Every structure is written in structure tokens, then in C-alpha cells.
């Protein structure tokens, strides 16, 4: 492949980005999409444009909250929980004008590189007037750290068993393209995941770098495990509230505020909200494709024992020396 050949859709974009992208290592993923390797992660050209714009132009505020994750790791749920936590001082969870009843979690907590910075490094963010401002990202920690420019804003990271991530991504990709879930596509995705050549991959390094950051700076980086959010939601929600400096009071706990938020943000409830059944994101994706099962271990219904064994071996090798286990 010619490393200097840039897809036509980038020709009118920022020359600095084009010059940088043309110099990067590249490969192709499961559907032959060309990916470029930047700061240890793989990105398609359009996503990388947004990453570079964000990294160059973002002006963080110390009160900002960034929700970070590898794709399909529980991002939508974490966004909903965070919004509900911060909104509880303003209105009741049952209020008809609660933000979660009026917009999808991804509309309420916009992606930096996938929405706000896709076209420019200086987007108008004045419409995001709330304090703290809520943003989200899938970029690797080393890339995010550079963009934050030493700001002490809060970062909340959620991680999930990569086998469930893979299956969730397969379903999501099929729903987004409005095609059937073909086994051959899952097999190709599996190969890309194992090589690490997948958008935002490799997933293992993505998780490890945020985990290390949470150990080094626990005051500003919170590391949540999706499976623990599922098995002990009350404990993890209170932990999140403490981290965001909005802990539940004794009175709130006694009147059931924790349970109210968990019910409001449950997959069952979010999935059945009118806004999530019929709405679309600004990029044209149906809201409903962000809600499927959310079950722990669903990958066993789709991956062969050999595929599971291979992923387990890679995980053991990648996580050796850490306390991380799926």
C-alpha cells in the first residue's frame, strides 16, 4: 500500500492532519477499512481527524468530567448514571423534563472526537453551559492526557470482558449497517480483535493504561468494572458519586434515591423510553441500537470454545503482572 495516499474525503481537511496521517503506520481491519496507528492505537481516517482536532484544540476546565471507555464496554449506561447523579439536586428522577427522558445519553454526554471535534479543532462549545461539563471519549489514555494539558478534571473509565465487547460490537455493527448478524463477520472481527487492529484497539493496552492511571492518580481517575456495576450496582453507584464529589446523604439513601437512579438508568427502562425507541443521533444512528442485552457472559452463546481459549490466553499474557482479571 502507498502510505502517502490519503482517502479523497480528507483532501479538503486540515493540511496539518493530512500530513501527519500520511506518515503513520497503517493496516486494515475486519472489513478492509484502512486504519492508522497513532500513539499506540488504531483509528480510521475520519475518527483520527477528530482525535487530532480534539488533542490540538480542546480547552479543558478543571471541573470537566470525562467518561472514557473502549467501545461497547458499557459507555451508554455509565453516561446515564452520571447524568442522573448530577441532575438529582435539580429535580426529581420522575420529573417529566428529566434530561434522560428528553435525549439519549450520547446526546447528553457528547463524544469529543466523534462529534464535537470532527470538523475543527475550535468548535463552539458555548452551548455546553452546565458546570461541570460532561464529555466522553474512546481515545487511549496517553492521547487523552495530552489533550487535557495537565488539567485536574475527573476521568471515569469503564472496562468490560473483551469477549462480551467483541460480541456486542458485532451486533452493534450489524444493527448500524442494517444487516443480519453474519457468522463470517464475527469470525473476521475476532481475528482483528486478537491482532489489536480494530478501531481504538488494541483493547488490552487501552484498559491497562487507564488502570495504571487510576493507580497513579486515584483522585482524578476512577476505574470501574462493568461486571461489578452489574453485580453490585448500589455499591458502584455510591462509589461513582463519591468520586464526582456528589455523595449521597443519609437522607437520600433513606428515601431510596440510590434505587431510584438505578431504576431510571436500568437497561429495561432506558430501552423502553420513547426517545430511545424512535430517536436518532446527530450522526444518523438509531438510538435503539445502543440498547441490546447488556448481559455478562453473553459471549458464550456466540464464541466457540477455541475462540474463548485464544482470547483468554491473550488476556493472561497482556495482563501479566497486573491485578486485572476478566
From Swiss-Prot:
Q: Does the keyword Translocase apply?
A: no
Q: What is its main location?
A: cytoplasm
Tell me a Gene Ontology molecular-function term this record carries.
sulfotransferase activity
* Active-site residues, Swiss-Prot/TrEMBL: 138
Binding residues annotated for 3'-phosphoadenylyl sulfate, in chain numbering: 72-77, 160, 168, 226, 292-294
The entry's function note states: Sulfotransferase that utilizes 3'-phospho-5'-adenylyl sulfate (PAPS) as sulfonate donor.
The text of the family note is: Belongs to the sulfotransferase 1 family.
Protein name in UniProt: Cytosolic sulfotransferase 7
Native species of this protein? Arabidopsis thaliana (Mouse-ear cress)
According to the entry, what is the taxonomic lineage of the organism?
A: Eukaryota, Viridiplantae, Streptophyta, Embryophyta, Tracheophyta
Gene label: SOT7
Amino acid at each position: 500500500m502507498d502510505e502517502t495516499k490519503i482517502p479523497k474525503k480528507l483532501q479538503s481537511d486540515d493540511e496539518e492532519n493530512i500530513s501527519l496521517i500520511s506518515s503513520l503506520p497503517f493496516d486494515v481491519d475486519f472489513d478492509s477499512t484502512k486504519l492508522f496507528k497513532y500513539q499506540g492505537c488504531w483509528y480510521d481516517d475520519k475518527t483520527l481527524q477528530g482525535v487530532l482536532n480534539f488533542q490540538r484544540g480542546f480547552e479543558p476546565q478543571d471541573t470537566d468530567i470525562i467518561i472514557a471507555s473502549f467501545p461497547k464496554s458499557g459507555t451508554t449506561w455509565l453516561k446515564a448514571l452520571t447524568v442522573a447523579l448530577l441532575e438529582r439536586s435539580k429535580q426529581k428522577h420522575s420529573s417529566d423534563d428529566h434530561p434522560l427522558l428528553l435525549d439519549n445519553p450520547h446526546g447528553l454526554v457528547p463524544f469529543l472526537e466523534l462529534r464535537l471535534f470532527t470538523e475543527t479543532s475550535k468548535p463552539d462549545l458555548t452551548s455546553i453551559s452546565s458546570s461541570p461539563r460532561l464529555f466522553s471519549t474512546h481515545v487511549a489514555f496517553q492521547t487523552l492526557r495530552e489533550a487535557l494539558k495537565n488539567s485536574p478534571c475527573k476521568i471515569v473509565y469503564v472496562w468490560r470482558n473483551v469477549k462480551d465487547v467483541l460480541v456486542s460490537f458485532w451486533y452493534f455493527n450489524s444493527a448500524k449497517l442494517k444487516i443480519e448478524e453474519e457468522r463470517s463477520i464475527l469470525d473476521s472481527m475476532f481475528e482483528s480483535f486478537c491482532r489489536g487492529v480494530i478501531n481504538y484497539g488494541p483493547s488490552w493496552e487501552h484498559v491497562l493504561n487507564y488502570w495504571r492511571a487510576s493507580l497513579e492518580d486515584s483522585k482524578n481517575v476512577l476505574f470501574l468494572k462493568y461486571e461489578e456495576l452489574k453485580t453490585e450496582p448500589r455499591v458502584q453507584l455510591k462509589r461513582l458519586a463519591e468520586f464526582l464529589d456528589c455523595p449521597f446523604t443519609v437522607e437520600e439513601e433513606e428515601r431510596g434515591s440510590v434505587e431510584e437512579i438505578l431504576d431510571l438508568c436500568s437497561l429495561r427502562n432506558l430501552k423502553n423510553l420513547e426517545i430511545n425507541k424512535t430517536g436518532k443521533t446527530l450522526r444518523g444512528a438509531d438510538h435503539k441500537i445502543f440498547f441490546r442485552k447488556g448481559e455478562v457472559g453473553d459471549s458464550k452463546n456466540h464464541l466457540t470454545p477455541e475462540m474463548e481459549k485464544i482470547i483468554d490466553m491473550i488476556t493472561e499474557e497482556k495482563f501479566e503482572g497486573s491485578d486485572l482479571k476478566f
